Each structure stands twice: as C-alpha cells, then as structure tokens.
Amino acid sequence: MTKSQGFQFKQFFIAHDKCAMKVNTDGILLGAIADIRHKRQILDLGTGTGLVAIMLAQRTDENTQISALELEPNAYRQAVENCRNSAFSDRLQVYQGDVLDYHFHQKFDLIVSNPPYFSESLASRSYERDLARAATQSHLDWLLQAKKWLAEQGEISFILPFEAAEKLVEQSRTSCLFCTKICKIITKQGQAAKRMIVSFSAQNVPLEEQELVIYDADNQYTEAFKQLTKAFYLNM
C-alpha cells in the first residue's frame, strides 16, 4: 500500500484511506505515553483509525482488554478493519456511537482520547472531517462522560492543543477530578509547547509534570523521542 493508504509500524499496519483523520504524531504520542501500569480494562474514545487502541494492545499483555468507540461510520469501519488485521485482534473491540450518548456497562482502568479540537468556525471541506475535528461538544463534556466509566483507581488521559489542555485543567477543578499528570509536547528544541497530554483521576495525588521534545536544534529526533517510539516506528 502507498503512504496515502496507510502507515506501517513494526508490529501492525494502520490503513487510513477511508478515515478523514490520518495517522498523526498526536495519536502516536498518546499511544506511547499513556500509563498502562496495572490497567486491565482500557477505553479509547474517538478512536479514528484505531491507532491508539492498537498501540496500547501492543504495550500490554494478554490480560488487558481494549475497547474503542467511534462515531463516524467510515472511521468506525476502518478501525474495525485495522483491529481485526492486527496481531492483537482477540483483545480489541470497536463500538460505534457518540461519546455522550453511549452506554458502557463496565468500568475502565484507563480511558484515553485524542479528541476533536477544531472550533465550529474552522469549517473544513468534508462532512467527515468536520465530524472528526469540529468540537461541537466540549472537551469538558468528554471528560465528564469518561468520568462515568472510570474505575475508582482509574486514569483519564487526553492529548490536546496546549491552550485547550490548560482550559480543561482549569474546568476540571469543579468536576471532582484531579489533574495528576502533565506532559508538555515541544515540537522543536527552543520552541514553546504546542500540545499537552493531561491525565485526570478521582484520586488526589501529587501532580507529575514532564516535557518531551520531538526534534533537537538540528531537526533530528531527540533521544527521548526515539526511546519512546522505537517499539513502533520501523526505522527508529
């Protein structure tokens, strides 16, 4: 397949020719950074191609089950295809539905999402892309819904543009959730952070903060980024 049809990782292939949102660095970072320790039930909200769900399946053992939820029909079918074709298919289940309307009858130890972040004013060229990125529902809506499905000791992790993440952290203070981890994503050494992975829990534990720089001053991948992604990227 060509790059426009999909992306080859070390242990799986992600087709994205039917999905408005393609394989991107945000999803790869979330899939590589999310804390999987002691997590047996994992949920990926707005899974798109299924990339993050499959990455988490690779990182966990046979005792961990991963569920994924996607609204847009083409993306849902693509995620089903990608999960079915992966070596982890027996631990992956994709559901179709709206995050705010869906009903899961179980609790999850880890809930992750690379959610919509474009505002309604940033109209795009296709209905599917609007559906994938126009945030007609707020990030707080998604966070509060995720809270309903969260196990007592569980964790929610979102990757968002920096300003949106800061806003969500502020909003979360009235939701009985605590921000437990912040990872600032810096594209190039010396630049300001443009993305952030923020994690929340019902447990009031000390905040962990870190930074990840993707490229050094010479436009080469940093050692930290290479170590983080070497289990996934073919040439890392």
Swiss-Prot record:
Keywords linked to the UniProt accession: Cytoplasm, Methyltransferase, S-adenosyl-L-methionine, Transferase, tRNA processing
SUPFAM superfamilies cross-referenced by the UniProt entry: S-adenosyl-L-methionine-dependent methyltransferases
EC numbers, comma separated: 2.1.1.223
Domain of life from the UniProt record: Bacteria
GO biological process terms on file: methylation; tRNA processing
Zinc among keywords: no
Keyword tRNA processing: yes
Catalytic activities: adenosine(37) in tRNA1(Val) + S-adenosyl-L-methionine = N(6)-methyladenosine(37) in tRNA1(Val) + S-adenosyl-L-homocysteine + H(+)
CDD domains found in the cross-reference section: AdoMet_MTases
Pfam families: MTS
One cellular component (GO) term of this entry: cytoplasm
Annotated compartments: Cytoplasm
Cross-referenced InterPro entries: DNA_methylase_N6_adenine_CS, SAM-dependent_MTases_sf, Small_mtfrase_dom, tRNA_Adenine-N(6)_MTase, tRNA_adenine-N6_MeTrfase
GO-annotated molecular function: nucleic acid binding; tRNA (adenine-N6)-methyltransferase activity
Family stated for the protein in its record: Belongs to the methyltransferase superfamily. tRNA (adenine-N(6)-)-methyltransferase family.
Role description: Specifically methylates the adenine in position 37 of tRNA(1)(Val) (anticodon cmo5UAC).
Protein name: tRNA1(Val) (adenine(37)-N6)-methyltransferase
Source organism (scientific name): Actinobacillus pleuropneumoniae serotype 5b (strain L20)
